[in-house]
Amino acid sequence: MEDGTQVSTLERVIKEVQAPALSTPTDEMFWSPEDPSKPNLQFLKQHFYREGRLTEEQALWIIHAGTQILRSEPNLLEMDAPITVCGDVHGQYYDLMKLFEVGGDPSETRYLFLGDYVDRGYFSIECVLYLWALKIWYPNSLWLLRGNHECRHLTDYFTFKLECKHKYSERIYEACIESFCALPLAAVMNKQFLCIHGGLSPELHTLEDIKSIDRFREPPTHGLMCDILWADPLEEFGQEKTGDYFVHNSVRGCSYFFSYPAACAFLEKNNLLSIIRAHEAQDAGYRMYRKTRTTGFPSVMTIFSAPNYLDVYNNKAAVLKYENNVMNIRQFNCTPHPYWLPNFMDVFTWSLPFVGEKITDMLIAILNTCSKEELEDETPTSVSPSAPSPPLPMDVESSEFKRRAIKNKILAIGRLSRVFQVLREESERVTELKTAAGGRLPAGTLMLGAEGIKQAITNFEDARKVDLQNERLPPSHEEVIKRSEEERRAALERAQQEADNDTGLATVARRISMSAGSGRSRRQRDAARETREA
């Protein structure tokens, strides 16, 4: 190393970091010794912690077995206290393990998850497989609700589909989508609390309305099922300037904002105490909204269980524990996790544009060896302002033809350099956290690592504002592809135009082509003289 330290290539440099699990488990390892009909939870926990993967058959078994249990459950679950309620997980498997440390072992603690197990984080499939395995073991003490990200539209737009294809196959992804459609939509806890992922709807009057939904499908972009998954409380909840119960949700691009009067009216009509929901990142991991006038209890509570969301929010996570009519909030911080490049790229694919850009820059620098005096001596001859004559066919052996060919090659190198620059900027783009200005972090941020990102986004509110566009209902798959192709085409055209307008590059090309041309002319004159002398 630079400091003279000798490092063995046969050992891990940082020995305290556990090596990834490179092999898939045998059936003996996968099945539990206590109950051979169920997966080994302790093994799965450690195997996933080491970034291990299952065989496709083992993963499919967990998903299908979990789906059968979920499909047998009603739209609206009912459970008694004690229970621990958890919010969004978003593929943060290592923080999910911390959640179980804080909340209690699932074998001894009853859990209700409010959805959003996948997307944004890079360990979504591990979260699904482990939670579904827990559901297989504890079907009557661990419950899973559906979030807005448990659908084909969002998982295709964000990271989950790509993750499934990278770590397993599209077959696993399709099995997950089928399973997501079986997830229940809501729960009534202790006959007092309505637990849902999103919020209320103009079409939700009584709990019977939830029971009548056909949930076994892709969520629509409007209607009761959409609102349960997508709605939010108004930002000025409890201090509304309008008397409307529901306002179009401009942040999400679908569904509604619901007001304090709407929440109070629903709770009173259904004889409930509060609405417990997830769906929104919170700096402290939770938020208590204005209390109702009749009970003095918060009308709405938001729980968010993904700490340091996207590795930049710097937020705490929380779980809500309800026992003996006492409600406790337990917060926890993030846990270190393995790093993935954006979109699961490997380091060689990610670095190629950087290497290409530097090589072409070096080539141009090598070619650019002319002095200022040479440039002044080799300025192009002015052309008469008379009417231009039509271009004449050029002899491929002529000096002018070869001069132009060399010039075009130099310009092509310049264009290639600009293209590599565009590709390098594409590699630097953080697709999961786009800034409002141009959809990118400042150039070079990723090269600075975690510290660079921390400097670019300094606090929770900055991160939330930057990430708002990713909280919206995404465009269709076809529209995304079309937009991406248009952006790439425009970027490459801009790169070519910049290269064509680069006066320094044009000067280099002219100088080298003229030098080459004059060299050929000199050789031709020498050859002719030798012929005459002979």
From Swiss-Prot:
Q: Does the keyword Iron apply?
A: yes
Its UniProt entry gives the catalysed reaction(s) as: O-phospho-L-seryl-[protein] + H2O = L-seryl-[protein] + phosphate; O-phospho-L-threonyl-[protein] + H2O = L-threonyl-[protein] + phosphate
* Region entry Disordered, spans: 375-398, 475-534
Cofactor(s) the record lists: Fe(3+); Zn(2+)
For biological process, the GO terms are: calcineurin-mediated signaling; fungal-type cell wall organization
Q: What is its EC number?
A: 3.1.3.16
Active site, per annotation: 149 (proton donor)
Q: Which residues bind Zn(2+)?
A: 116, 148, 197, 279
| SUPFAM superfamilies membership | Metallo-dependent phosphatases (SSF56300)
Query: GO MF terms on file?
Result: calmodulin binding; calmodulin-dependent protein phosphatase activity; metal ion binding
Composition skew (Basic and acidic residues), residue ranges:
475-497, 524-534
Q: Which residues form a coiled coil?
A: none
SMART domains documented for this protein: PP2Ac
Q: What does this protein do?
A: Calcium-dependent, calmodulin-stimulated protein phosphatase. This subunit may have a role in the calmodulin activation of calcineurin.
Subunit field text? Composed of two components (A and B), the A component is the catalytic subunit and the B component confers calcium sensitivity.
Q: What is this protein called?
A: Serine/threonine-protein phosphatase 2B catalytic subunit
Q: Which organism is it from?
A: Aspergillus fumigatus (strain ATCC MYA-4609 / CBS 101355 / FGSC A1100 / Af293) (Neosartorya fumigata)
Give the gene name: cnaA
